[in-house]
Amino acid sequence: MARTGENIYKRKDGRWEARYISSYNADGKAKYKYLYARTYAEVKTKLIRVQNSVETKVEAEKIRDREKYEFWLFEWLRSKRIGIKDSTYIRYRNVIENHINPDLGKYPINKISTPLMERFVSNKLNNGRLDGNGGLSPKTMSDMLTIIKESFKYAQTAGADTICRFDGISLKRNSQEMRVLSVFEQQQLISVLFEDFDRYKLGVFICLYTGIRIGELCALQWKNISFSEKAIVIEHTMQRLQNDDPNAIYKTRIIITEPKSKASLRTIPLPDFVVKAIKPFVSSPNAYILSGECKSIVEPRTMQNRFKGYLEEGHIGDANFHSLRHTFATRCIEAGFDVKTLSEILGHSSVKITLDRYVHSSMELKRSNMEKLTPILV
């Protein structure tokens, strides 16, 4: 005989049995324990006493969880889910799961001090890459700190106490020079490209002489090129993201969206020699430039692999696809472009980014300028 709703039963041996939830596993499934007594009243008294104790314990665990930074980190992430792009949300989640939570999540939020945060930042700058090959860039670390700061603000608004102050935390590390192809390497690459010139090589050529990003290249359609205006219009970017759907066949998916900043929406004038190289490949307006088809795409990873192959073919030192953008910008500075114009062509959100990143003299430019001193000194 069972007492409805009480989880109390009379056993065949005459004793009374009570069942109660003792805890929950990681999937949220209840774990049960059992109590026994000779009478219903006795087992019910035991059950009430244990349930009160369990409820107190569960409540205490909830309080402890709320004290941990991990709780506030994921609460902040949930609060951001609506109103941001999928790509932004996935980037936030990956940074939290791969970097922030493993190192800081276990600490009570009111125990995360400025010195602890400084050690965290220093470690990430020097040894933070997931593949073990060195540290994260200051830009990546700056983005990570933004997430941390925002989650702290969220926790403070909800009443959590914090002691960490972010002012003065240094993001400097031993600087690594950008990989820029030398003039000779650029000539070698061009020789490789014009041998059996195809759509993939055209893509590399376009990036080398416009500085567009790999995602922007892959999203380009023929309607984005105006031959009458001799210009290329950048209005989309392509990227591969993790698939949030647990039932999806594939773990990742390709998306094409607008660039993340308004400055990236831009029109770039094309030199005549670039227009001439592009024209033989023209297809229908909605076809993608790299595939020549409307329903077929070439994704960034494919272009990265193709580019690596061209470097090997030309006996050129290792570089990633983004080096084409650095090379374009560097050649423009060497040719005397004004920084404002270059900044707009590159799609930078501010001229300062262009100045900090590209306005530095090459050895050739230094030598050329030093030669100008000769008539003055002799």
What name fits each language-model region?
Residues 61, 65-71, 110, 163, ...:
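Major-groove DNA-contacting interfaces characterized by cationic-aromatic clusters
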Residues 134-138, 142-144, 157, 161-163, ...:
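Basic, Lys/Arg- and aromatic-enriched nucleic-acid-binding interface segment
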Residues 173, 180, 238, 275, ...:
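Catalytic-site neighborhood detector that most strongly recognizes the C-terminal catalytic loop/helix
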